[in-house]
Amino acid sequence: MWVKSCILLSLLAVATYGQAHLKYTKEANDPEYVERHVHSQGHGHAHGGHGHAHDADGGCPYAKAAAAEAAAAAAHGHAHDHDHGHAHDHGHAHDHGHAHDHHGHSHDEEDIHDHDHGHAHEHHGHSHGDHGHFHGAEQTRKAAKQVASEYQYTGALSFLNDAKTRLWVYGISATLLISAAPCFILMFIPIQANTSESGPLLKVLLAFGSGGLLGDAFLHLIPHATPAGDGHGHSHSHGHSHGGAGGHSHGAHDMSVGGWVLAGIIAFLTVEKLVRILRGGEGHGHSHGHSHGGEKKETKETKDKDSKDKDSKKEKECKKDEQTIKVTAYLNLAADFAHNFTDGLAIGASFIAGTTVGVVTMITVLVHEVPHEIGDFAILIQSGYSKKKAMLIQLVTALGALSGCVISLLATDADALADAAASSWVLPFTAGGFIYIATVSVIPELLENSSFFQTIKEIFALLTGIFLMYLIAIYE
């Protein structure tokens, strides 16, 4: 009897296990069940304790089946509950994408492989980052090498590798170039001396020079002597005309600039008057000798007393005119020397600020000096100098620019020195001298013995000189 009972229990256990296994297999291969189970998170959490225990053992189906068999041997109801939990846990395993794989070991390998692959990917990304860092460092080294080799000279120019030496060479060379370039242009002017044949062209050049002097004074020197914020300060002074020391101070500064311009005019007038008094009736009629040589011979050969008196009067008048023009030439050279001195200060300070700034300043000063030097050349020719001698005297004024450049390069604060010179009495005083030379000494020469067509050319030349200075003032 008990043997039959044991056999019956064994058959019941086998049937229960087979039913559970069949249920497991069916549920695992049923897509609808899997989909329902994946979305039913609440039911899974109800068996969370048991399910997590199965997750801890690696999610192996055989381990779960063994546990189900042991539970079935204890009680039928618990076996059913566990089977249901097992099925749910298996559904959880299906979330990993391995619901159809009954080999949990292979799943672990795949999971490990995935992890290793992710790690390898991260490592690859890290390597890529390292490569990017290396690429950036390489670019930095190339840029540094390019900057370092920008001023690398070899051979005869190797001395320019020293920054201080290079600064001096650039500054002095730029100053010499500015002084020599106008002389190169003067070589092509078809005037050799002050003769009657070259008179019309010389007057046109004098008109051009006077326009350059006036434009330089009113459009360059005087504006540079006035502070940059002058317009704003002026309106502010008018707005507070009853109140303040600030407006009074600005008005005093305006008066000082105009006062120095007047001082320059009066100083040049005084010097010319003193030279005339000291030299008296003496005159160096070098130019007169060229233009009136025939009249001299005629005076010596003629025995008529009236003719001698007329010729002597004409000669004295010409000598006085030449004497006046000579004094004007000297005064113009003095003013040009002072002007070139301030240009030299600006060139030195600009090269200290940088090579590019220095080159731009050099070009600006060069364009500014060309019409100015042509006018000086015409005044020197008019005063009796030959073309060669006038060009050599023009080079003497370059000493002013050289001295200004040297002082600027030696100064501890070249920018402050250049700004101080620009805002001091030097520029307005020089402007007054240029105004005096143009209006008192040069323009009166244009009023004598000119035809209508010659007058048109002279006025056009005068306006051209002013317009060139205007263009330079705009783009400076």
Swiss-Prot record:
GO BP term, example: intracellular zinc ion homeostasis
Region spans: Disordered: 71-146, 229-250, 281-319
Keyword Transit peptide: no
Compositionally biased intervals (Basic and acidic residues): 78-98, 106-119, 127-141, 292-319
Annotated TM spans: 2-22, 171-191, 204-224, 255-275, 347-367, 390-410, 424-444, 455-475
Glycan attachment points: 194, 340, 449
Membrane topology: Multi-pass membrane protein
GO cellular component, one term: membrane
Domain of life: Eukaryota
Location(s) in or outside the cell: Membrane
Keywords: Glycoprotein, Ion transport, Membrane, Transmembrane, Transmembrane helix, Transport, Zinc, Zinc transport
UniProt GO molecular function: zinc ion transmembrane transporter activity
UniProt record similarity statement: Belongs to the ZIP transporter (TC 2.A.5) family. KE4/Catsup subfamily.
Function description: Zinc transporter.
Protein name, UniProt field: Zinc transporter zipt-7.2
Species for this entry: Caenorhabditis briggsae
Gene: zipt-7.2
